Design a protein with these regions (language model features):
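Bacterial N-terminal signal peptides
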Residues: 9-18
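N-terminal leader/linker segments that initiate helical-solenoid repeat arrays
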Residues: 20-59, 63
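Terminal, low-structured helical/coil segments at or just beyond the last alpha-helical repeat
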Residues: 20-34, 209, 213-250
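Conserved alpha-helical positions within TPR/SEL1-like repeat arrays
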Residues: 36-47, 70-81, 104-115, 138-148, ...
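Structural signature of tandem alpha-helical TPR/SEL1-like repeats
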Residues: 47-60, 82-94, 104, 115-128, ...
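Structural marker of alpha-solenoid helical repeat scaffolds
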Residues: 64, 98, 132, 166, ...
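Boundary/linker segments of alpha-helical solenoid repeat arrays
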Residues: 103-104, 137-138, 171-172, 205-206, ...
Length: 250
């Protein structure tokens, strides 16, 4: 009888320990799922434009995992969409503190500084992003934009060319190259670049508009009218004064 009781107690203890271990694993699994669920809720909220809810969900993730770089990055983006510049910058810097090799954090910092008109700081951040990821197309493009704002046309052109060198079908890069050639008074090269942008993205409104202006300069008025009309259909507001100048050629 005592032997049976002894075995019963041992078995009961083993079952209890197994139950505890299983419970711990379940709790860990629930915690991991909960983080992903909060991420999904945050993503869905941001897609709907409900930024307050998105911020709240990312903050819940960070309470569970304070060093979750993805949550800090996404929270920064949400703050940026809310116009909360200081909080946005703070989150991107927190990402860099956690992992200094996340190129997107530097890129987003560059975007934030650029929007504030802090061009030198934006330039530095884009360069840091490119040091980590030399094939970061958008960083090359945005660095080109900074150089253009600083009236450094050759440097801007170089960055845009690097972007299309990485991704030949990058329509924005071809459009920006066309804009540089336009400013350099190289009309033929500008037109070729705008046309290439439209081959990739036929409804690129800005490229249609740019071609309309370029063809007007070349006195190819039918083509100017064609692209001006297409620009309007693609969602851009064409300068009424420009349309007035085209009227005699319709």
């Amino acid at each position: 009888m005592k032997t049976n009781l002894k075995y019963f107690c041992i078995i009961a203890l083993i079952l209890f320990l197994i139950s505890c271990a299983s419970g711990t694993k379940t709790e860990r699994k629930d915690k991991a799922l909960s983080i992903e669920e909060h991420f999904q809720l945050a993503f869905n909220a941001a897609e709907r434009g409900n930024l307050e809810e998105a911020v709240s969900e990312y903050q819940k993730v960070l309470k569970m995992d304070p060093k979750n770089s993805r949550a800090h990055l996404n929270l920064g983006i949400a703050y940026g969409r809310q116009g909360k510049w200081k909080q946005e910058i703070s989150e991107y810097k927190r990402v860099i503190d956690i992992d200094p090799n996340i190129a997107e954090a530097y890129f987003n910092l560059g975007v934030a500084y650029n929007e504030r008109g802090e061009l030198n700081e934006a330039l530095v951040q884009y360069q840091k992003a490119l040091k980590i990821n030399p094939n970061y197309i958008e960083a090359h493009n945005n660095l080109g934009v900074i150089y253009l704002k600083k009236e450094k046309l050759d440097e801007a052109l170089s960055e845009y060319q690097k972007a299309i060198g990485i991704k030949p079908d990058y329509a924005k890069g071809h459009y920006n190259i066309g804009s540089i050639f336009w400013q350099k008074k190289n009309l033929e090269e500008a037109i070729a670049s705008f046309q290439r942008a439209l081959e990739i993205h036929p409804n690129y409104a800005e490229a249609h508009y740019a071609l309309a202006v370029a063809y007007y300069e070349k006195q190819e008025f039918k083509l100017a009218i064609q692209h001006a009309d297409q620009a309007g259909k693609s969602g851009i507001i064409v300068d009424p004064k420009y349309l007035e100048r085209l009227k005699p050629y319709r």
